[in-house]
Amino acid sequence: MAAINVIFISGAIALFALTGSCSESTNPFTNKPYATQNPYSPPQTNQPTKRPYQPGPAPTPAPYIPQKTNPPTKRPLNPTPSPTAKPPSENSESENSEGPVLIEEDHFTVDANFKCGIPPVEPDLKKGKIVGGAEAVPNSWPYAAAFGTYDISGGKLEVSQMCGSTIITPRHALTAAHCFMMDPDIDQTYYIFMGLHDETTYKGVRPNKIVGVRYHPKTNVFTDDPWLVYDFAILTLRKKVIANFAWNYACLPQPKKIPPEGTICWSVGWGVTQNTGGDNVLKQVAIDLVSEKRCKEEYRSTITSKSTICGGTTPGQDTCQGDSGGPLFCKEDGKWYLQGIVSYGPSVCGSGPMAAYAAVAYNLEWLCCYMPNLPSCEDIECDESGEN
């Protein structure tokens, strides 16, 4: 099994996207960040990657796989120009132009003295269609953070949201590895944007620079296989996240415990809504979980809950482009737990049969290696190989 790959970030260049073409790097630094992960190399035939197309009711359809210049449908957005200025909250600190700004110790101790999974405002669970455009109550999902680059135009901060992410500790967020499929060596400068609700105003938004990315060692994102497994990336944040009314931490689930089939969980994001409105605000969708057996029947016989869980059987209720890496939250004992990471699904959002999510509960042995003193990790033995 390949060693765990950690990619440290420096510099600022143009944004890539998984639904558009990849622009050439403009990294001003001569020393490229270290990485051992091979970049994605698609075959020469038409093939795609994320959210493979599912024609009709056939249980095991042949996926269509796009070329690298015509990337996957699940779920980042379009490329943007290089940033021209720092976000307001970053201006007070100088950047290290000689290399990445990183904590010295990779296996560092996380301040575990915090509460998780309790929002300052209760979400309205009576509505829920991302594709249908149901807006979330502001501050009701404070663990969700947009992820991408930024620009400043006319003195106004403009976020180029590419994926979603979830804050899980004061120094970490979790997203999908395939969000970096077109930029595996991390040639750009990325941020998570905490407290974001409306992308047209960015009122109260706090950018937090991503200074490290760690892929799951068993992910196949950077291979030719269109059926993603272990679609995880841990994001290390430059600034400590201090919880407040606008941002907070999601709870990690109990190890190897997934809610039963039929449980209603929730996914949130800023993804597109198929021209149904609400593209600029945080939206939410109700997702009913399905069994591993049904997930195998709809997608691939080798799917296992160790890497993937599935859900979302109601027509028209789905995540969509721009929601990749975002959360699947399930509520238990009054708290919200991060059970899944948005990975792939039907190429036409909401058309069925269901979406696939990276399974958090079965990957805590790997995840907890890098935040061992979290309450959720106390009794979990670290396994850096990702074997679960």
From Swiss-Prot:
Reaction catalysed by this enzyme: Hydrolyzes arginyl bonds, preferably with Pro in the P2 position
What tissues express this gene product?
Answer: Detected in sperm, but not in unfertilized eggs (at protein level). Expressed in gonad, but not in hepatopancreas, intestine or branchial basket.
Q: How is its activity regulated?
A: Inhibited by peptidyl-argininals with Pro in the P2 position, diisopropyl fluorophosphate, phenylmethanesulfonyl fluoride, leupeptin, antipain, soybean trypsin inhibitor, aprotinin, ovomucoid, valyl-prolyl-arginyl-chloromethane, glycyl-valyl-arginyl-chloromethane, p-aminobenzamidine, benzamidine, zinc chloride and mercuric chloride.
Q: Which residues participate directly in catalysis? A: 178 (charge relay system), 231 (charge relay system), 324 (charge relay system)
Where located? Answer: Secreted
Q: Is Signal found in the keyword set?
A: yes
Enzyme Commission (EC) number: 3.4.21.99
**What are the residue boundaries of the Peptidase S1 domain, all occurrences included?**
130-372
GO BP, one annotated term? proteolysis
Where are stretches of biased composition, namely Pro residues?
54-64
The EC category is: hydrolase
**Which superkingdom?**
Eukaryota
Q: Which Gene3D superfamilies match?
A: Trypsin-like serine proteases
The secretion signal range is 1-22
Q: Where is the composition biased (Polar residues)?
A: 29-49
Known role = Trypsin-like protease with a narrow substrate specificity. Preferentially hydrolyzes substrates with Pro in the P2 position and Val in the P3 position. Plays a role in fertilization.
Q: Quaternary state and partners of this protein?
A: Heterodimer of a heavy chain and either an L1 light chain or an L2 light chain linked by a disulfide bond.
Q: What is this protein called?
A: Spermosin
